[in-house]
Curated annotation (Swiss-Prot):
Keyword rRNA processing: no
Catalytic activity: D-erythro-1-(imidazol-4-yl)glycerol 3-phosphate = 3-(imidazol-4-yl)-2-oxopropyl phosphate + H2O
The species this protein was found in: Bradyrhizobium sp. (strain BTAi1 / ATCC BAA-1182)
Name of the featured protein: Imidazoleglycerol-phosphate dehydratase
GO cellular component: cytoplasm
Cross-referenced InterPro entries: IGPD_sf, ImidazoleglycerolP_deHydtase, ImidazoleglycerP_deHydtase_CS, Ribosomal_Su5_D2-typ_SF
Protein's gene: hisB
PROSITE patterns with a match to the protein in the record: IGP_DEHYDRATASE_1, IGP_DEHYDRATASE_2
One GO term of the biological process aspect: L-histidine biosynthetic process
Keyword Zinc: no
Entry similarity comment: Belongs to the imidazoleglycerol-phosphate dehydratase family.
Main location: cytoplasm
Amino acid sequence: MRSATIKRKTKETDIEVAVNLDGTGVVNIATGIGFFDHMLDLLARHSRIDMTVKAVGDLHIDFHHTTEDVGIALGQAVRQALGDMAGITRYASIHMPMDETLTRVVIDVSGRPMLVFRTTFPRDKIGEFDTELVREWFNAFAMNAGITLHVETLYGENAHHIAESCFKGLARALRSALAIDPRNQGEVPSTKGQLGG
């Protein structure tokens, strides 16, 4: 089973994350940030990754540390659960609609971290959640999962819909890219014979 648990404690946050890449999208999320919990719930359910996220952070300051540190821990958990990445599909691309919004997400599970994030929001906040934290989370996740990730919102007007299309797009791209391709017969999908080097 491709699964991992990560515990990460700093002076700012105390986080425990568990993932099962071969799950059915079972979710247990509690970060203390309602909108962020909603986005992580979407990520788990649409990727079919079983996901537990427990986070206690310095929310009296703002949501930045908790959001970023959850991205770090989730990325580390996915990377650990992947092991040597043998048999994975590796690449995926999705166009994700959310009402008037359309976002393209392209992923390469390469072991080489990179984020290209071309998404803007029409306002600074969704409820109490700073929209700039969407990019912060995606960056933390991509860097620690070791994936190349391109996120581009082609058009959209509603900030909630834009954020949701980004998270759902990532979910469906992960679902495809992390899937085991039986034609790979357990081989690492790289001419180098390994990923990440």
